[in-house]
A protein has these predicted regions:
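Forkhead-associated
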Residues: 72-115, 119
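Intrinsically disordered, low-complexity acidic Ser/Thr-rich regulatory segments
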Residues: 1-66, 76-81, 109-132
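Amphipathic hydrophobic-ligand
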Residues: 68-70
Length: 132
C-alpha cells in the first residue's frame, strides 16, 4: 500500500489521506509546474500566481497568448480543500478551461497531468507537481 510520511510528526499515512491522521498537516505538493504543450517551456512556482497575456507571451513563448486577457487565471493553494486550484479572473473574453471544461468562478482542483487551456484548444498548459 502506498503511503506518505508527515514532515511535521513523522506519521506514516495512507496515500489517499489528504491530511496527516495525527497532526492534520496537509499533504499538498509544494511546487506546481505548468508546461506549454506547444513550446515545452515551463513556469514553476510555490505560491499563488496570476497568469495572463504577458506571461503566456514571454515565459511560454506561445503564439496562442494573443487570445488571453491581461489577467486570465490564477493558481492558488486552498488549505481547506488541501489542493491547488485554478480559478478564472473575472471579465476575460475567452474562458479558462481545465481538461476541456470551463472553470467555474470558485475554481477547480488541479491534478497531475491535467491541462489548463484558453477555450478548449488554445494555450494548453500541462500540470505537474514536484514532491515536497
Amino acid at each position: 500500500m502506498a503511503t506518505w510520511i508527515c514532515p511535521e510528526d513523522g506519521t506514516e499515512n495512507p496515500a489517499a489521506e489528504k491530511r496527516c491522521l495525527v497532526c492534520r498537516h496537509p499533504n499538498l505538493p509544494r511546487v506546481v509546474v505548468l508546461t506549454s504543450l506547444a513550446t515545452g517551456k515551463e513556469a514553476e512556482f510555490t505560491e499563488a500566481k496570476k497568469f495572463g497575456k504577458a506571461v503566456f507571451t514571454h515565459r511560454f513563448a506561445d503564439d496562442d497568448a494573443k487570445y488571453a486577457a491581461d489577467l486570465q487565471f490564477e493558481i492558488l493553494r486552498d488549505d481547506d480543500r488541501v489542493a491547488w486550484l485554478v480559478r478564472p479572473c473575472p471579465g476575460t473574453p475567452n474562458k479558462t478551461c481545465y481538461d476541456g471544461f470551463a472553470v467555474p468562478a470558485e475554481g477547480v482542483e488541479l491534478a497531475e497531468g491535467g491541462v489548463i487551456s484558453l477555450g478548449k484548444t488554445k494555450m494548453k498548459l500541462k500540470v505537474r507537481f514536484k514532491k515536497n
